[in-house]
């Protein structure tokens, strides 16, 4: 784990793929939270559930790499939480997906919720917009580069539902390479060194009024695509 930036309010980290953000059921290895507590013990009382995820305002899946912001005090935690809730934080991701997209840019939106078939997965009803704001999801995407069997996308989620990007790209027929949970049978046996989803940048106005922009370079696996 790499610290990109720190001040009295925030810690910005570059999370590697394979590192869980916080402990969960069956998690025995060290997590991002464990490393943060060693270096920044003051965050142990910060957050909604500080005994499990101190300072954590947003999360990345274990298999996802990239930039994350962590709150260093409760006031900043509440401030950042409000920014995320009101979509005032700009997030961009890189995603390598199977196939060639007909539409080179577009959006996916709809209502998300827990799958009725598998409680461990999320599902999407595309195009369904209800009054339940907590379920609404929206993702913009654009093709950056095309390969023989894959496409590299820049993805901008406008909401923050669990597994949102993974579910949305799967829903349009282009699952993320290396994603074992949201894929099709035809791709399940195709080996990949990782799940190719990377949080590449984060931008927002801090509690001090400063405008911040943080980015994480794509991991080496993204440079080995053919």
State what each model feature region is.
Residues 1-226:
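RNA pseudouridine synthases
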């Amino acid at each position: 784990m790499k610290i990109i930036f720190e001040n009295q309010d925030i810690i910005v980290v570059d999370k590697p793929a394979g590192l869980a953000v916080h402990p969960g059921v069956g998690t025995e290895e060290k997590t991002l939270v464990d490393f943060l507590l060693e270096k920044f013990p003051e965050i142990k009382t910060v957050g909604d559930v500080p005994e499990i995820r101190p300072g954590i305002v947003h999360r990345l899946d274990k298999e996802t790499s990239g930039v994350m912001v962590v709150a260093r005090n409760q006031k900043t935690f509440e401030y950042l939480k409000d920014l995320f809730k009101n979509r005032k934080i700009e997030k961009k991701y890189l995603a390598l997906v199977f196939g060639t997209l007909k539409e080179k840019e577009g959006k996916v939106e709809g209502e998300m919720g827990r799958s009725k078939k598998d409680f461990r997965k999320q599902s999407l009803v595309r195009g369904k917009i209800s009054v339940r704001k907590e379920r609404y999801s929206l993702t913009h995407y654009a093709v950056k580069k095309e390969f023989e069997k894959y496409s590299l996308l820049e993805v901008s989620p406008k909401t923050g539902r669990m597994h949102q990007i993974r579910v949305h790209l799967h829903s349009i027929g282009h699952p993320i390479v290396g994603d074992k949970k949201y894929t099709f049978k035809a791709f399940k046996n195709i080996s990949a060194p990782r799940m190719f989803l990377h949080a590449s940048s984060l931008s927002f106005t801090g509690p001090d009024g400063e405008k911040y922009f943080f980015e994480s370079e794509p991991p080496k696996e993204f440079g080995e695509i053919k």
